[in-house]
Amino acid sequence: MSNNQTLFERAQRTIPGGVNSPVRAFRSVGGTPRFVARAQGAYFWDADGKRYIDYIGSWGPMIVGHVHPDVLAAVQRVLADGFSFGAPTEAEIEIAEEICKLVPSIEQVRMVSSGTEATMSALRLARGFTGRSRIVKFEGCYHGHADSLLVKAGSGLLTFGNPTSAGVPADVAKHTTVLEYNNVAALEEAFAAFGDEIAAVIVEPVAGNMNLVRGTPEFLNALRALCTKHGAVLIFDEVMCGFRVALGGAQQHYGIKPDLTCLGKVIGGGMPAAAFGGRGDIMSHLAPLGGVYQAGTLSGNPVAVAAGLATLRLIQAPGFHDALADKTRRLADGLAAEARAAGVPFSADAIGGMFGLYFTEQVPASFADVTKSDIERFNRFFHLMLDAGVYFAPSAYEAGFVSSAHDDATLDATLDAARRAFAALRA
């Protein structure tokens, strides 16, 4: 029995399902999860000592690679001064100033410890600001595990949402309306029916949890116009795509200014950190200034802030995002070319440092499109690549990530492994 198997069996005795986040359990793809022993740059090593090229990067935060020396040094500098204080620090001001500088739509920002906290708090703030209750989200977009966001579409376009998780009361779900992503007509119909009831629309401008699906400019511009017309708060959930699609996030890429933005992953540099921020007149409704309560013992944790600040400074290097996008595009195009040469139906897309792999002929534009992917073939591909030392997301519904540490050698090795994997799929 491998060390990974031994650890997984042991973990299941004390941790539900053996993991602390469901996708890690390999339920979708089968087999034994890899327990990570250490990581460096573009690689990690599992409990059996096998090395993998890592295209998850802790699900997005490791944009400069694992254990970057500048990030490590920043963390080491603050450790000797204390791990957590429950009081303000100068570093909190510095990271807030950095975020506001890089994302112009953010006039003020509040630090939290997870993406779920960020979206949950942003929705509460939007409701407090507008005095309304209804939330609009989109099928396939994941915004964390707050009750009001674990909701799927009802049987009709404008029906109340239905809970997708046990433990979510129907009375909570009924305040969430779920529409099809990239469907402008559905959006217009919803606003025509109850636009003046909508507190907020929350959207991933580049979705990453139904695999990678880009918002179309038409769709996102319609969102902005309709929210403005009806007084609803437009929330961009950029926990995943923030600082990855562009230095100023997807909103910079599309040239669209949301009212509130949720950030995470990259701003913690691998540590637990997230944030939400936006217009000053909205943010002023937060306690202690206003009546919308939000708090957190570890919010603005000095160790996490140090890692995040170091990462944000590294990604401002001239040409950083252009180089990252070029690498990611080379990977996506190379995989598509290898599949085409092997005669395997496959498509790929990339934007900034994110990519998507689909066992379909066309790049998807909605969750319904994503569900047409050949899941069995994806699972086989995943394990063939895993055996070859390449670690993609263990689910056909997750985006992948490239870091600045991925070099030509890692990309070449990945494409060589893919050539063999696609040939095996065709056989």
UniProtKB/Swiss-Prot annotation:
It catalyses: (S)-4-amino-5-oxopentanoate = 5-aminolevulinate. Pathway: Porphyrin-containing compound metabolism; protoporphyrin-IX biosynthesis; 5-aminolevulinate from L-glutamyl-tRNA(Glu): step 2/2. The keyword Transcription does not apply. One of its GO terms (cellular component) is cytoplasm. Signal peptide: none annotated. It is found in: Cytoplasm. Pfam families: Aminotran_3 (PF00202). Its EC number is 5.4.3.8. The keyword Nucleotide-binding does not apply. This is Glutamate-1-semialdehyde 2,1-aminomutase.
